[in-house]
Amino acid sequence: MKNKHSKIIIWILAALSPILCAVTYPFLPQQVPMHWDINGTVSYEGKATFIFMAVLPLLLAGLFIYLPKIDPRKKNYAKFSKYYDYFCMFMMVFLLIANLVVVSESFFPGRISVGIVIQMLVGVLFLFLGNMMPKF
């Protein structure tokens, strides 16, 4: 990551999920929706799984920052560092939205069409990646 501001933004975005978890955890039901199949059927997990979902962005942010340092072809990151930063930020936002959906569905089941939200997010990810890849 070339830009120091990008690192800060990525860490802030990654920290929002654990903050969301800390604020909502005491009020969550014992079973939290974690998985939606292709038909929209919900699988429920214990609250401990939600903690992992909240910590995952922090782990990925650390990995995204550490990977360019250990990659044998680390000099190639200079070619696409701006887009790498954007990708990292997008993934943090993606995971934050996923956590928000889980919290919303925990408190108000059926309020959000999870399949449509995830399809839109994956579609935006492919648009972003398809637009970015020809540039490096």
Task: Label each region the model flagged.
Residues 2-32, 37-136:
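Feature 926 captures the class I aminoacyl-tRNA synthetase adenylation module centered on the KMSKS loop
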